[in-house]
Amino acid sequence: MPLFTANPFEQDVEKATNEYNTTEDWSLIMDICDRVGSTPNGAKDCLKAIMKRVNHKVPHVALQALTLLGACVANCGKIFHLEVCSRDFATEVRAVIKNKAHPKVCEKLKSLMVEWSEEFQKDPQFSLISATIKAMKEEGVTFPSAGSQTVSAAAKNGASLNKNKEDEDIAKAIELSLQEQKQQYPETKALCPPAESQLSNKVARRVRALYDFEAVEDNELTFKHGEIITVLDDSDANWWEGENHRGAGLFPSSFVTTDLSTEVEAATVDKSNVIDDDVEEIKKSEPEPVYIDEGKMDRALQILQSIDPKDPKPDSQDLLDLEDICQQMGPMIDEKLEEIDRRHSELSELNVKVLEALELYNKLVNEAPMYSVYSKLHPAPYSATAAGVPVQTYPVQSHGGNYLGHGIHQVPVAQSYNLGPDPMGSSRSLPPNMNSVTAHTIQPPYLSTGQDAVSNPSYMTQSSHLQAAAGTAAYTPAMGVSADLSSFQSTASGLPQLAGFPVAVPVPPAPQPQASYHQQPLL
């Protein structure tokens, strides 16, 4: 799919403004005017194609394009008037007049603008034509007056109408004469054969066709290369009248030769050369696909910098083509710049997000970990007895039922076990030498009836029992615990006497004066 769609009016406009045209083809011009209203965006495309021909370097082509422009303004209605009164058209008109085009082209364009300003002066939508004329007059450009323009336009229109009428009359007369000749030939042949032979010897002439010719009008003759044509009238230097097996009609004299001995091969070679030339011209006229080419832009800038502004010579065709291509690159360059800007914005947003993520990462790395606070709330579990700490075991002997109170059954002796030092002693407020004692419940002294006390005086207190069982290593309670231990005697007297368990008690240090400590409740 091409990047740019072809202008639907370009081919017809080029045909109507061909530099080889001798007169204006009004049938084609009116056909173009009719297509403007029926084609989508027709007014803009048609005006663009016309202005392209107005800027042609051949003045004859530019004058024909201005004639076509005037016909479109007069016949296409308001849609074409709005395009003529647009800013783009005003800019192109300024460029044509200020670039010092051919004087006849400039004068005709100025005359058309004055005529349009007079025609559109009552409609405020078309005031740009008058404003453009006024601005250019202030810049020193001269325009013809409205009165002289009206008179010259009327005279020109009248002359053109008369000329068209004369051409139509001549064409009708030629057609009638041809019909009369066709009707008279059979009668002449039947009535007077000698006169016919004399006429044929005098008028008829045979020629050979060099190229193919396809009839466009009804009164033209179609023939192929190499065919023999009988010439009936050669009074006109350009168009002859002749006949062949297809009929009779007019044909161009340059397409035939009077030399019947010309080899067909030579004509074929000439025809192939002509076809090659036509193909090359078509290829040149076909627009190349436009894309962003930095080389062409640099080349155009280099040519522009090398040109002398004071040089009166017109610009080369190569420069004009490069300028046209560079102008067509404009929208594509704008789209490319928009895409680059959009990608730059996306990358900028991504960069901001990456920086925010890095900042958050650094913040989290520099913060203190939460698990250190959590570990302080949960102390370590009890450890085994530290190595090197002596542990003494006090055996407890079970005694008979003489030491039981009334109604209390004997409890079997439990298995002996050892308790290590209390690991939580360091977190309390008691002195270090009292940790192991306060960590365990002290067995209250056994109080029995008087009979038991008499029979067994050695078991009055738990301390006396422990001293008798331990032998030399007697246990002496600390001073700060005596008051606490005595508070349990009243409650323990009603309980049955249980078998004692060996308790690990550290060796008490030498007696030292100690400060008073107060026990705090455990957490």
UniProtKB/Swiss-Prot annotation:
PROSITE patterns: SH3, UIM, VHS. Keywords: Cytoplasm, Endosome, Membrane, Phosphoprotein, Protein transport, SH3 domain, Transport. Residues 165-184 form the UIM domain. It is a peripheral membrane protein. Residues 360-377 form the ITAM domain. It is found in: Cytoplasm; Early endosome membrane. Residues 334-368 are annotated as: Interaction with HGS. The keyword Ribonucleoprotein does not apply. Residues 16-144 form the VHS domain. Residues 202-261 form the SH3 domain. Belongs to the STAM family. This is Signal transducing adapter molecule 2. It comes from Rattus norvegicus. The lineage of its organism: Eukaryota, Metazoa, Chordata, Craniata, Vertebrata. The gene is Stam2.
